[in-house]
């Protein structure tokens, strides 16, 4: 959901600017910094920063967060957020906090990011479920679908470690499963996964590679990017089992529907339509002309978003 990740980035960037902007009207003379012969107030800081790109993104993210919390707060539980957080933490093991810090995140801000992502995902999926799915849509999804497969997957933080492991599995008589258990950085040392081409808990690059391999074949090094924390990981996979694909798409109709609906999360136009609907329902009005254009991407054709007087 790269489009949404771009929007949500502002939740943790320049949060201070947004906080200050919220209290600017009543505390605009509050002193933030003092020096000989001068001071810097909340108003000074707000006026200096509000036109920056980061401030624009931060305000947009704050608006979306407030709107979706109001409309969908009870649709995402703390348990779901913790589960998603733990899943990523387990993936990176002991280096997770370092990875977060390198991305400008803390555990708390990353959890906020996860929560907002899930709120928007819920809204997008609900809207997608109400869309009519044609036979053409089903057939296209079927053509791209690979049914259940089992693979041994090892993961690395460093490309050089992945290269060393690749050389090891290429050696004559090498035991891929044993090497994977020894070398993978997964916190629980899990290496065996069963999934289909619609899997979303594994990196998309890994799923695509596995879908394209024949049973018994091994990949080269696969580079995956986690857009939430802008971190690359490296993977080597071996497909050990693949189910035979049935000839009739109707045999997979329920699963194909899930995949089509989930695919809407990657459609920026559909996302924008859902967000625009939520913003319209919330009757969002921009009061400061500095932020007049932050909702432009969600406006209907020929509709402008002027600042309110």
Swiss-Prot record:
Residue ranges occupied by any PpiC domain in the UniProt entry: 146-241
The UniProt record lists the keyword Lipoprotein: yes
Naturally occurring in which organism (per UniProt): Streptococcus pyogenes serotype M6 (strain ATCC BAA-946 / MGAS10394)
Protein name in UniProt: Foldase protein PrsA 2
Keywords, sorted A to Z: Cell membrane, Isomerase, Lipoprotein, Membrane, Palmitate, Rotamase, Signal
Function: Plays a major role in protein secretion by helping the post-translocational extracellular folding of several secreted proteins.
Pfam families: Rotamase_2 (PF13145)
Gene giving rise to this polypeptide: prsA2
UniProt-listed SUPFAM superfamilies: FKBP-like, Triger factor/SurA peptide-binding domain-like
Subcellular location: Cell membrane
Lipidation (N-palmitoyl cysteine): 23
């Amino acid at each position: 959901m790269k489009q949404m990740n771009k929007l949500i980035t502002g939740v943790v960037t320049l949060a201070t600017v947004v906080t200050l902007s919220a209290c600017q009207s009543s505390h605009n003379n509050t002193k933030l910094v003092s020096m000989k012969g001068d001071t810097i107030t909340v108003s000074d800081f707000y006026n200096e920063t509000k036109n920056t790109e980061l401030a624009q993104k931060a305000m947009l993210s704050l608006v979306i967060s407030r709107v979706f919390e109001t409309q969908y707060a009870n649709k995402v539980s703390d348990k779901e957020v913790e589960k998603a957080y733990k899943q990523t933490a387990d993936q990176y093991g002991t280096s997770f906090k370092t990875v977060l810090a390198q991305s400008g995140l803390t555990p708390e801000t990353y959890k906020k990011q996860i929560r907002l992502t899930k709120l928007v995902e819920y809204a997008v999926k609900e809207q997608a479920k109400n869309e009519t799915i044609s036979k053409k849509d089903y057939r296209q999804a079927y053509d791209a679908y690979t049914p259940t497969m089992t693979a041994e997957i090892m993961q690395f933080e460093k490309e050089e470690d992945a290269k060393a492991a690749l050389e090891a599995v290429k050696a004559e008589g090498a035991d891929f499963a044993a090497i994977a258990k020894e070398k993978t950085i997964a916190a629980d040392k899990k290496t065996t996964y069963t999934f289909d081409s619609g899997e979303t808990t594994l990196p998309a690059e890994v799923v695509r590679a596995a879908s394209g391999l024949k049973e018994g074949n091994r990949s080269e090094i696969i580079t995956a990017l986690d857009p939430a924390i802008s971190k690359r990981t490296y993977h080597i996979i071996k497909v050990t089992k693949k189910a035979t694909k049935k000839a009739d798409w109707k045999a997979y109709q329920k699963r194909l529907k899930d995949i089509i609906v989930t695919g809407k999360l990657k459609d920026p136009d559909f996302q924008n339509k859902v967000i625009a609907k939520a913003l319209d329902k919330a009757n969002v009005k921009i009061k400061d002309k500095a932020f007049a254009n932050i909702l432009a991407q969600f406006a209907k054709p020929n509709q402008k978003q002027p600042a309110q007087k």
